[in-house]
């Protein structure tokens, strides 16, 4: 009787957490099972005026100690260099940053000659988007298939399994998006538009959808000829 009652109470507690605190439930689930669920935390600063360059350090810290940047993509940047992550239009503003964490080879890693040569990394994706949005994930974990839900508090963290790979790592972005926008405005970009800005090993690629506006910058913020 006590076992049944305890099980019932645990079940009711889990159900309540799933409704009122899904992120806490997924965190508990991760600790118990070892399966890494998507995590979430608030963005740095005002989500309605989110500056991904100014907030970059918080994204890197969320990715994990030693995380190295692979790329950064900001969708729908306003002329002042910020995104309104609370905007209700679709598709909505979003920042995606890809990182890599160097890790030790897993216990079941193949030997050299069977695909085991190279450095092992875990790829980490940090996304900043509209707070309050709920996500649902179905995946296969160490103990079998799992399904869970989470609520975005401002940015999310998703980590892949270890794998060997080769990356070109980037320094932290230093070109203010407002400065890139100023160059685009001088070249005729509409001031009431929003831009997509991508940062990778070739520099910054500034584009405005729907109109023929594209400006490319090097990593020193200078326009490429």
Predicted feature residues:
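Long, charged/polar, surface-exposed segments that mediate recognition or autoinhibition
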Residues: 117-194
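Hydrophobic single-pass membrane-insertion segments
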Residues: 16-29
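Exposed beta-strand-loop-beta-strand "reactive/processing" segments of non-cytosolic proteins
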Residues: 61-140, 193-225
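Functionally engaged cysteine thiol sites
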Residues: 1, 175, 221
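Intrinsic disorder/low-complexity detector
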Residues: 5, 26, 30, 35-40
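A generic structural signal for ordered alpha-helices
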Residues: 6, 37, 158-162
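Hydrophobic membrane-insertion alpha-helices, especially the h-region
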Residues: 3-19
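Short, non-transmembrane alpha-helical segments in secretory-pathway proteins
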Residues: 34-86, 167-195
């Amino acid at each position: 009787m006590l076992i049944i009652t305890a099980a019932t109470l645990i079940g009711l507690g889990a159900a309540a957490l799933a409704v009122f605190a899904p992120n806490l439930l997924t965190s508990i689930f991760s600790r118990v099972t070892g399966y890494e669920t998507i995590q979430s935390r608030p963005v740095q600063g005002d989500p309605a005026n989110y500056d991904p360059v100014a907030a970059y350090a918080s994204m890197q810290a969320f990715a994990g100690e030693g995380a190295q940047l692979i790329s950064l993509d900001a969708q729908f940047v306003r002329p002042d260099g910020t995104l309104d992550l609370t905007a209700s239009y679709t598709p909505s503003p979003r920042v995606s940053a890809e990182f890599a964490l160097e890790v030790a080879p897993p216990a079941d890693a193949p030997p050299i000659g069977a695909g085991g040569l190279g450095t092992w990394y875990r790829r980490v994706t940090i996304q900043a988007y509209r707070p309050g949005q709920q996500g649902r994930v179905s995946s296969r974990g160490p103990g079998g298939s799992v399904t869970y839900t989470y609520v975005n508090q401002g940015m999310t963290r998703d980590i892949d399994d270890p794998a060997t790979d080769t990356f070109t790592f980037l320094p932290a972005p230093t070109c203010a998006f407002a400065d890139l926008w100023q160059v685009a405005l001088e070249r005729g970009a509409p001031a009431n538009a929003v831009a997509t800005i991508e940062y990778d090993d070739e520099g910054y690629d500034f584009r405005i959808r729907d109109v023929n506006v594209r400006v490319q910058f090097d990593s020193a913020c200078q326009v490429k000829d």
